[in-house]
């Protein structure tokens, strides 16, 4: 299986998805160790908390986002940061039996929670995907952008793994533009959600995960920087669609006539 050489991936300056968060880790080694621990420990709680917080609307929104990005029946999909399979479940329903899906995640604990038949699961990171060049018609990253270590490396890998003409969808939560909206979302995510997590969750680390979740949202780079990074990686037709002012959908296309990298 072709993957990008480690030496190539190490070239160039590192672009972080958000400023460092010393309350959780001191350096990149600790960052990766923290992410592995927090997602492994909270995997069994994740779907339960998501259903409560989204009030049952999550599946419909994910389905519509995939449709807007151009996912088609029969597509070969690579879902990066598959987690427990929430986005992959909707993708499988849309691609049908003629399609295929590969789910990738660095957390074995999360992968154990994926209850989907007929898909492949691989342990891996966005910065070095265990995928062949041009393997995918469609590549998705659902609410995991804030957890990558290097935006440029990750987007270069997405470009490599997509076939020419392949489509990309990145789902993320963005800070509201208004001060009031931002304050309300912060209070919800930083205070109320951890309280709900302590009540509903079975694992002690779950409330910590949701506090970290908000802190990464608050520290995340601006949407314009994400769009610029996608364009720098070689993608075309880069667009951002938003729902309710906070749910961002970044869609893009790999040019039909292109090399592996720009």
Model-predicted regions and their roles:
Residues 76-129:
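Class I SAM-dependent methyltransferase SAM/SAH-binding core
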Residues 55-73, 90:
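Conserved alpha-helix/loop element of class I SAM-dependent methyltransferases that forms part
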Residues 137-151:
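A short SAM/SAH-binding and catalytic strip from SAM-dependent methyltransferases
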Residues 233-262:
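Core SAM-dependent methyltransferase catalytic element
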Residues 30, 175-229:
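C-terminal alpha-helical "lid/dimerization" subdomain adjacent to the S-adenosyl-L-methionine
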Residues 152-164:
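A short glycine-rich, Lys/Arg-flanked "PGG" loop and its adjoining helix->strand segment in the class I
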Residues 166-173:
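Conserved beta-strand signature within the Rossmann-like core of class I S-adenosyl-L-methionine
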Residues 127-139:
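A short acidic, Gly/Pro-enriched loop at the edge of an enzyme's catalytic core
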């Amino acid at each position: 299986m072709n993957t990008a050489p480690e030496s190539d991936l190490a070239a160039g300056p590192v672009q972080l998805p958000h400023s460092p968060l010393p309350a959780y880790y001191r350096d990149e080694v600790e960052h990766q160790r923290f992410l592995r621990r927090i997602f492994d420990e909270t995997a069994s709680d994740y779907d339960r908390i998501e259903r409560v917080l989204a009030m049952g609307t999550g599946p419909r929104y994910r389905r519509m986002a995939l449709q807007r990005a151009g996912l088609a029946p029969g597509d070969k999909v690579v879902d990066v940061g598959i987690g427990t399979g929430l986005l992959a479940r909707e993708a499988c329903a849309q691609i049908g039996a003629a399609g295929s899906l590969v789910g990738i995640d660095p957390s074995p604990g999360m992968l154990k929670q994926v209850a989907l038949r007929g898909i492949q699961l691989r342990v891996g990171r966005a910065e070095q995907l265990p995928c062949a060049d041009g393997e995918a018609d469609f590549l998705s990253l659902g609410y995991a952008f804030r957890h990558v270590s290097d935006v440029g490396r990750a987007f270069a890998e997405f470009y490599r793994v997509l076939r020419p003409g392949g489509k990309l969808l990145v789902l993320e939560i963005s800070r509201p533009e208004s001060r009031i909206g931002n304050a309300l979302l912060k209070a919800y995510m930083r205070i109320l959600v951890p309280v709900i997590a302590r009540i509903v969750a079975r694992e002690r680390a779950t409330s910590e995960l949701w506090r970290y979740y908000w802190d990464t949202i608050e520290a995340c780079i601006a949407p314009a920087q994400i769009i610029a990074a996608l364009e720098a990686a070689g993608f075309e037709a880069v667009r951002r669609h938003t729902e309710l002012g906070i749910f961002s959908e970044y869609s893009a296309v790999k040019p039909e006539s292109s090399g592996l990298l720009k």
